[in-house]
């Protein structure tokens, strides 16, 4: 009987991030695409500025990588979020499942693991679908900073 009750609890509520399988870990990603937007770092302060400039591999409409399995071949600077380096990614969005679970919080109601699709996430405008621009169309990345510092006004 106890095994039956345990199996009714979603893995993200019954396991720590460290105890999850690779498949479970990957499924936590909601596919919002926010990790796939380029960031700029201030050389003097190390402050990170977010842009709406999408990586060349990001399909903006679907918010999915065109070459996920081989992404590091195409984009050597692509991030790889792991259990070990998760604490170093302080810039992860407040809506990120990895961040939320690491902070002891639950998944948001729109998360694809709860809803079965990305539709609610897109509807809540969590994904970059509505803001991202193609890297090839950008001339000055500073014009695309979302969290502009005072000096950029």
UniProtKB/Swiss-Prot annotation:
InterPro entries: Puta_zinc/iron-chelating_dom (IPR005358), UCP006173 (IPR008228)
One Pfam family from the record: CxxCxxCC
Family membership: Belongs to the UPF0260 family.
PANTHER family on file: UPF0260 PROTEIN YCGN
The name this protein goes by in its record: UPF0260 protein CKO_01185
Organism, scientific name: Citrobacter koseri (strain ATCC BAA-895 / CDC 4225-83 / SGSC4696)
């Amino acid at each position: 009987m106890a095994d039956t009750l345990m199996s009714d609890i979603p893995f993200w509520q019954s396991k720590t991030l460290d105890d999850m399988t690779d498949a479970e870990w990957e499924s936590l990603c909601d596919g919002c695409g926010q990790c796939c937007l380029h960031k700029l770092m201030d050389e003097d302060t190390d402050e990170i500025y977010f842009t709406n400039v999408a990586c060349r591999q990001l399909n903006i409409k679907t918010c999915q990588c065109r070459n996920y399995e081989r992404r590091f071949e195409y984009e050597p600077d692509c991030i790889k979020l792991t259990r070990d380096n998760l604490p170093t990614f302080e810039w992860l969005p407040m809506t990120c499942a990895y961040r939320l679970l690491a902070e002891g919080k639950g998944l948001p109601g729109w998360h694809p693991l709860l809803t079965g699709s990305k539709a609610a996430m897109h509807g809540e405008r969590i994904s970059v679908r509505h803001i991202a621009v193609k890297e090839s169309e950008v001339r000055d990345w500073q014009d695309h900073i979302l969290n502009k510092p005072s000096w950029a006004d």
